[in-house]
Design a protein with these regions (language model features):
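FAD/FMN-dependent oxidoreductases across multiple families
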Residues: 136, 275-369
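Predominantly flavin-linked oxidoreductase catalytic cores and closely associated redox partners
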Residues: 122-307
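Short beta-strand to alpha-helix junction loop
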Residues: 96-119, 287-292
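C-terminal helical "tail/cap" subdomain of flavin- and related membrane-associated enzymes
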Residues: 375-473
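An active-site-proximal "capping" alpha-helix that borders the catalytic cofactor pocket
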Residues: 8, 18, 362-386
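N-terminal FAD cofactor-binding segment of flavoenzymes
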Residues: 21, 25-27, 36-88
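Core beta-strand elements of the Rossmann-like FAD/NAD(P) dinucleotide-binding domain
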Residues: 2-4, 168-177, 341-344
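N-terminal Rossmann-like FAD-binding beta1-loop-alpha1 element of flavoenzymes
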Residues: 2-31
């Protein structure tokens, strides 16, 4: 049986960062990635799907400055985010949070970003293996790696592993620590966590994909010159134009007049629960929630159809994305979870639920949680992980959870109201730096600001979906 210090299930930003940190710390680290083909990558790699944008202070959370990336990773430098409602609009030009990055943020090419993280891990000494599917993880809790060789020591002097990672090929990999980085689908994570949770509180039920995730869809389209000029340095979000909790479309700019035009929404919505006439992207005769591609077509027709032939003037870039210029993927819309660290297991990134349903940002916290887990695995003690990730990203998670909770039941009229009083809302979401004049938008702004602060205090006390105290060993 192959033997390593730390086995990492999944090779996205969290998994590759865990491998880099573990190898940098002197551990023998192995990434096991099933591998996904993409039109914009010439080798198998992780899924590499998201809206791919980073705000200024996320640079410091992630711990990687964009100057470190290879050419072509960063696509556009940003100076603002635009929030558009059915009839109102607001623009955010500063997050108000201190950062080592001078701009507002940047967009990036996700496959190149993931490839850079992979190369960095391999350069540090980790092995990154693709085309490998993990069936499960068997754990012997009686084995403590800190005890040194135990049982029958192998030729490398190491004893029995605490974990045996079973591969679909029938092969096995022994490891002292396991980092679960298999993303929001949690194909392996849920099965592993179920071993440490009561049957009536199983992770496979609480973190089931249809209830714990949103579905996202985006297209890579080359847009007309004047449209690109208007959005090439901005993130654009529309709120209150499609039904569902934290459901919204967006435009994120790439290079060469290419924009990623996408959306996210809950899974399994019933259109009969919504007023079709209230939403700009629904038609009165819709019999079901539109598919992602139809939503994008309607968005473009609504915004640009008076001036352009959308299909001719906004063509798909077929050599981009996963396939034919499009991609569909899940994003976590649940609260983050603690890990069963007494078993030498850490859950990181999307698998632990750090992605924000409010703005889909998640790569920065994936990199950071993976790096913490890899560092601790190399040190031989995973026990501090749950405390460490909260210290590193807790404030960010609380902001995201608070805003998602506050807008969960909003309808189009609510979005018009909140965007119309955006001074307080945007200030509250991004930090105290924008609160110099919190009341200038009137009573509506006061209500929003006070509501945010009250909800934030409530969320701070309970923002973890599965607490470490729930695990049974």
């Amino acid at each position: 049986m192959e033997r390593v210090d730390v086995a990492i299930v999944g090779g996205g930003p969290a998994g590759a960062s865990a491998a880099h940190a573990a190898a940098t710390g002197g551990a023998d680290a192995l990434v096991l990635e099933k591998g996904v083909p993409r039109a914009d990558r010439d080798r198998l790699g992780p899924d590499s799907t998201d809206a791919a944008g980073i705000l200024d202070y996320w640079v410091d959370i992630m711990g990687i400055h964009p100057d470190e990336f290879d050419d072509g990773v960063v696509q556009r430098e940003l100076n603002r985010a635009e929030f558009r409602g059915p009839d109102e609009a607001a623009t955010l030009t500063s997050t108000g949070i201190e950062s080592s990055y001078d701009g507002f943020g940047y967009t990036f090419q996700r496959a190149r970003f993931d490839d850079w993280l992979r190369d960095r891990a391999e350069d540090a000494g980790a092995e990154y293996r693709t085309g490998v599917s993990v069936r499960g993880v068997d754990t012997d809790l009686s084995v403590d790696p800190s005890d040194g060789p135990n049982g029958d020591a192998g030729p490398d002097g190491r004893g029995d592993p605490r974990h045996v990672v079973e591969l679909a090929s029938g092969e096995s990999v022994g490891a002292d620590f396991v980092v679960l980085a298999d993303g929001p689908q949690r194909t392996v994570t849920n099965r592993v966590l179920d071993e440490y949770l009561p049957a009536d509180a199983a992770a496979s039920e609480r973190l089931a994909s249809r209830t714990a995730n949103h579905i996202a869809y985006q297209e890579y389209r080359r847009v007309p010159e004047d449209v690109y000029e208007a959005v090439n340095d901005a993130l654009v979000f529309w709120w209150g134009v499609m039904p569902g909790e934290t459901a919204y479309p967006w435009i994120f700019p790439n290079d060469d007049r290419v924009c990623r035009i996408g959306l996210t929404m809950p899974i399994g919505l019933d259109i009969d629960e919504f007023d079709r006439d209230a939403y700009a992207l629904l038609d009165p005769d819709d019999e079901s929630i539109p598919q992602g591609g139809e939503y994008i077509r309607r968005l473009l027709e609504w915004q640009y159809g008076d001036e352009y032939d959308v299909e001719d003037d906004f063509p798909l870039v077929e050599d981009a994305g996963k396939r034919n210029g499009t991609e569909t993927y899940p994003i976590s819309s649940t609260r983050p979870i603690d890990s069963p660290t007494d078993a030498g297991v850490a859950v990181v990134g999307g698998a632990m639920g750090t992605t924000s349903a409010f703005h889909e940002g998640g790569d920065h916290v994936a990199v950071r949680t993976g790096a913490i887990a890899g560092e601790l695995a190399a040190a031989g003690d995973m026990a501090p992980y749950n405390r460490r990730w909260k210290e590193a990203i807790g404030d960010e998670i609380v902001r995201n959870v608070t805003m998602a909770d506050m807008v969960a039941d909003y309808e189009p009229a609510d979005w018009n109201r909140i965007i119309g009083a955006a001074d307080a809302m945007l200030a509250a979401e991004t930090g105290d730096g924008l609160l110099a004049q919190p009341y200038r938008s009137g009573w509506e702004s006061v209500k929003l600001l006070l509501g945010y602060k009250w909800n934030k205090r409530r969320v701070m006390k309970d923002y973890v979906g599965i607490d470490e105290s729930e695990y049974v060993y």
